[in-house]
């Protein structure tokens, strides 16, 4: 992220032009404001303190939901949402950097500097979403961005536009109250894909090219975890094993070498490996079991049943706990595939599509302790310490930049990527309060005993 202030990459204009559809200026449907008034009543904003406005938090989340930012879509995926957020951050007086992390994939980073020296805390999130699928499977418009019965509804409401709105307004609240150190607010591209935004951010941080940021001492990833404080996350490996033989007529299979039986042998070997890993390491108390799951098989032409294929490729989704060394596991699987191919007279190629190691931030790390304190301050109860079943951008920030991360955000763990996605307004506001308290604890130190 070269340069300073509001910068660009790949020719991006430093200051986005106003959106012709009114993204930056148009209000959310008036029903949202009315519903908020009814839902929040006299407490509207009171629980957030004078530094923040409850309605503004939900209004921003609703605006973001109304923007269709599907990560598999053509062209500029995050652009409209990034433009909205960048404009708001500039209004707050932050130093703003907008970059194209990959072609058509926009990220925005806002930096807020305190009034005295101190540590640097990062809030991190994303605005790309998975597809809504068949709209007929929804009972409402997937991009409604409305509040009904105390719930903000629509694709991306829980995962994780509510979390983005909460972290932006939490940082603003801390800014207005004064603080030590620095807050970095990063909305990074392509989390639902290969996490290209987080990878680019980590590279730029290592190169020292992020304006105003020379280090980051802790990261709060604002993904939906049902209000649990999650310092651990499963690792993930996306793997393809391609066996290569020789094509032949189905009537004369001896004229070729069929790779499909080798796939069957590999499937059995994967099951054996999973059994050994589970027997050796057991279930993780917060993450559950290690899983090696075959997900895709590509071989032959479905219209040519009489042709023996030359190649067969197996895709495997692997989920690990901190007990598993990915390098050792991948070496074992490569040896296994090689033996199977040799015995069958085949060629083989093992491709690691992506390798995301587990995250295991110590509970006594200051960023975890700050988030625990923030939850306690916001809710009056101790937080449940949990684990993230999938990978987040925090996985990449830990792997590539060595950053300590903890995941905490509004919305249920299991509602993401489903039809009729929603998040409770009360949970959005509780998360905002928790972020404010966590940031103050991390940056200023714990409050003095009364």
Question: What residues fall within each predicted segment?
Answer:
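Acidic-glycine-rich active-site phosphate/pyrophosphate-binding loop
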Residues: 132-147, 216, 231-242, 406
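Hydrophobic/aromatic beta-strand patches that form the interior of the parallel beta-sheet core
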Residues: 97, 119-123, 186, 218-220, ...
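Short, conserved micro-motifs enriched in small and acidic residues
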Residues: 152-165, 172, 191-192, 257-260, ...
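Short beta-strand segments
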Residues: 124-125, 186-188, 220-223, 242-244, ...
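Metal-dependent amide/peptide-bond hydrolase catalytic core
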Residues: 2-4, 43, 47, 76, ...
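Acidic/His- and Gly-rich active-site-bordering loop/insert found
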Residues: 2-5, 11, 21, 25, ...
